[in-house]
Amino acid sequence: DVVMRMRERAEFPRAVMEKLPKLKLLLATGMRNARSIDLAAADELGITVSTTDALHQTTVEVTWMLILALFRGFLEEVGSVRKGGWQRGLGVGLDGKTLGVLGLGNMGQPVAKIAQVFGMHVIAWSPNLTPERTKPHDVECVSKEDLFKRSDAITLHVPHAKETEGLVGAHELSLMKTGAYLINTSRPKIVDEEPFIAALTNQSIGGAGLDVFNIEPLPDDHPFRLLPNVISTPH
């Protein structure tokens, strides 16, 4: 009678609905998750489709957990203490650093606001972003190239679409500072994985904080599990 659909990329077409004659209610998590449901077919078949509010806050929290862990060397220090050691390095403060926000929407805005509390300068870019839209948030609107060149950390908050696949590729990664971090709590395909792994392996960028992956769970031998400059959390 009721189906709860959790994964937004799992399509729910007419053919599936027609095989469920008792189905009366189809639930999806998050507003965007209804996009892959055949809404016209649901209406015709008398199936009610309902979605929950998107949980932006949890993604914002995970984003900042990763940013802070990277800058402060959290995993290395905790690991050292657990092994009987003590301080291994010096954490880096956020005050005066530049955070690049790729996508200043429902998640990018609170991420930017928290950065400003820490004393960071926030710059942002997305394909349709304008200075008029960034000014109320005290965020500098910049070009895509400037964002990758100037940022000490870059966090991704754009939706997965044909236009955003591979938005961060070899060229963009080559523009990043040697010690800069890339944080992705958005969608994995926004970043071209092969040059990304190469940049992390060669340490041409400082590291990454990741909560989304092309394959979930990650294979045991995947670089995102093994590279010392990557913090991966299980989405």
What are these regions (language model features)?
Residues 2-78, 92:
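Phosphate/diphosphate ligand-binding glycine-rich loop within oxidoreductases
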Residues 77-110, 137-140, 144:
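Glycine-rich NAD(P)-binding loop of Rossmann-like domains
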